[in-house]
Amino acid sequence: MKLLLLARHGESEYSAKQLVNGDPGVSCPLTEAGRLQARALGRILADEQIDLCAVTEFERVRETAQLALAGRDVPFVVVPELNDPRYGEFEGGSLDVYREWIVGRGPLEAPAGGEHRAEIVSRYTAGFRRLLDRPEGTVLLVAHSLPIAYLRDAAAGAPPRSKMDQVDYATVLRLERQDLEPALAVLEAWAASPAF
């Protein structure tokens, strides 16, 4: 891979209600606004040569990618390592309640039945490495806010923070291969010795 284009999915039924969903088995399609955002993403990407589209296991992500790439012959690959976090006891609940809980915790603390942030970062890094090893030149990754935010900040040299800024729906971040290697090194170093 030479170029990675990253885009968050469009607004979903859960995100519109500020609810968390880390279980890909739970149906969570896009809202009408999310479908419009996905089509707008397609217009943004219209002039891009895309050799492969990577998605997660989540319906909202696949739907966004399919709408954005409608009419184009682009193969898809599922990268489950880039799924949203497993929220455990917070699954299906308020995003604000989860954020309030998680911000006060260290990177090795997890909600019951969920993942801690060092696990999440390690999983994401493995997923990004899978993409980096792909033979295709340009890969579009449609994913979730958190993996994109971690990679975006790491590309600027910043390790994960206890509270990450949300990534806007259906916008594009471009990272060249030479930007990805140091960004992944930042994430791997943090995951090996996590601290906020």
Place the predicted regions along the sequence by residue.
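Active-site signature of alpha/beta-hydrolase-fold catalytic machinery across serine-
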Residues: L67, Y150-A154
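Short beta-strand scaffold positions
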Residues: V55-T56, S122, V142-A143
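Generic beta-sheet signal
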Residues: L4, G137-S145
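Glycine-rich phosphate-binding loop signature in dinucleotide/nucleotide-binding domains
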Residues: A46-Q49, L131-G137
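Phosphate-handling substructures
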Residues: Y14, C28-P29, A70-Y124, V186
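Active-site-proximal alpha-helix that buttresses catalytic centers in soluble enzyme cores
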Residues: K2, A7-R72, E115
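Acidic, low-complexity terminal tails and accessory targeting/binding regions
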Residues: M1-K2, I44, V77-V78, P85-D96, ...
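A generic secondary-structure signal
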Residues: R43-I44, A126-R130
